Amino acid sequence: MLKKIFIKTFGCQMNEYDSNRIFDTVKKIGFEKTEKYEDANCYLLNTCHIRDKAKEKVYHEIGRVKKIFREKKKPIVVVAGCVAQAENQEMLKREPYIDIVIGPQSYHKINEAILNHLKNKKKEEETEFDTISKFNYLSQIKNKDSKVSSFLTIQEGCDKFCHFCVVPYTRGPEYSRPFDQIINEAKELVQSGAKEIILLGQNVNAYSYDEEGKKYRLSDLLIKLDSFDKLERIRYTTSHPKDMTDDLINVYKTSSKLMPLVHLPVQSGSNKILNLMNRKHTIEEYLLVYEKLRKINPKIEFSSDFIIGYPEEDEQDFKMTMELIEKVKFINSYSFIFSPRPGTVAANLTLVDQKKSKQRLEIIQEKLFNNQIKKNKSLENKILNVLVENKMKDGIKLFGRTEYMTSVIFDGNIENIGKLVQVEIISSNQNSLFGKLTESSKKKVA
């Protein structure tokens, strides 16, 4: 009988990529994927440790699984990802229902862990930083993720050690995959139907790989991918302002496939706070990158991340953040109240009054919300290029994205999926655009 695995993924796009590759791996020992908890022989939770209460989410999910399988045979329970890396021994002690914990740099060993557990009925723990072995192994397994828009990890870990961040401790130091390994996986994705590839890394623009005296950087990868005939779009995330080098910026001038949306987290508009965060750049340096990019390609827009209520943030610091938002006019951003992560420098700092932090968060989110509304409203009555990704749940409308990652919903034929079409925008809200196929796009399908 074929074994079934249920995979639930929390957190970033890299976790989504990891979950896909975990499934590619466990297929080798006979697993197929199920979307139903109750059918699973193996339940895997791929976790994120960035936000507050990450551990408690894990225990809550395990509690749900316990209830479902109260009168059924217990599945193998695997906790993977960054929470597993950070809390491995504690998790195994606190929750006996967990059978295996496996860190993000060890999931190539998941088959061995599962088979050992089945044989010995003992808890298994794999949490070594073994990034080279992981990617060498994964390069031998075909990436079956054939979505129209597909993720591709090129770099992992971080050496920046921002004082609020757990990534250096859960993902390890910066590691860049071999250039040819990435290109080969990209070719597989395109051959499987991918029209857009999103390059991933905790610090993706720090990508640097030396081979026989040749140093490859992110710009080299982008230029190579730009030459793929059947690939329509290229994106990358997440970037650090310090690594936004001139060679990378110049690709925005020459590439027709690199999308004009740059996700460039800044976290705060105050140099005082950036210094306390150990961000290793100033607002002036951030704005210089912004100006260079806009000069190279005036179509470029920006999105960002903001941490509100970081220790010692005062009204003047917050005002500077609001001024930065007004200047750059980010079209999409993520903002959160600071939550201390165990093991980081900031975990030991005095918190800003939570009432003040919540008030500031409401103000900044309203500003960012209005920016999005204004941007989307400006697109009404315009014709946009949309990459069609899938059909909506109603089975009638189609879903796609613009160059700026904005969702577009419209009536269309399923034969449009995977194609670039032109859509006339009729209306909008904060998150989405609504439109209709142009006559020329209808004729192409017909």
UniProtKB/Swiss-Prot annotation:
Where is it mostly found?
Answer: cytoplasm
Q: Does the keyword NAD apply?
A: no
The enzyme's first-digit EC class, named in words, is transferase
Gene that encodes the chain: miaB
Q: Where does [4Fe-4S] cluster 2 bind?
A: 158, 162, 165
One example of the protein's molecular function in GO is:
4 iron, 4 sulfur cluster binding
Provide the family line: Belongs to the methylthiotransferase family. MiaB subfamily.
The chain positions of domain MTTase N-terminal read 3-119
Compartments, as annotated in UniProt: Cytoplasm
Cofactor annotation comment: Binds 2 [4Fe-4S] clusters. One cluster is coordinated with 3 cysteines and an exchangeable S-adenosyl-L-methionine.
Q: Which CDD domains match?
A: Radical_SAM
* Keywords linked to the UniProt accession: 4Fe-4S, Cytoplasm, Iron, Iron-sulfur, Metal-binding, S-adenosyl-L-methionine, Transferase, tRNA processing
Question: Which Gene3D superfamilies does this one have?
Answer: Methylthiotransferase, N-terminal domain, tm_1862 like domain
- Which residue ranges does the record assign to the Radical SAM core domain? 144-374
* Function (record text): Catalyzes the methylthiolation of N6-(dimethylallyl)adenosine (i(6)A), leading to the formation of 2-methylthio-N6-(dimethylallyl)adenosine (ms(2)i(6)A) at position 37 in tRNAs that read codons beginning with uridine.
Q: How does it assemble?
A: Monomer.
Gene Ontology CC annotation, any one: cytosol
By its UniProt entry, which SMART domains does this protein fall under?
Answer: Elp3 (SM00729)
List its EC numbers: 2.8.4.3
- Asked if the keyword Metal-binding belongs to this entry, the reply reads yes
Q: What is this protein called?
A: tRNA-2-methylthio-N(6)-dimethylallyladenosine synthase
* Domain TRAM residues, every copy: 377-439
Which cofactors, by name?
[4Fe-4S] cluster
**Chain positions recorded as [4Fe-4S] cluster 1 binding sites:** 12, 48, 82
Which transformation does this protein catalyse, written as a reaction?
A: N(6)-dimethylallyladenosine(37) in tRNA + (sulfur carrier)-SH + AH2 + 2 S-adenosyl-L-methionine = 2-methylsulfanyl-N(6)-dimethylallyladenosine(37) in tRNA + (sulfur carrier)-H + 5'-deoxyadenosine + L-methionine + A + S-adenosyl-L-homocysteine + 2 H(+)
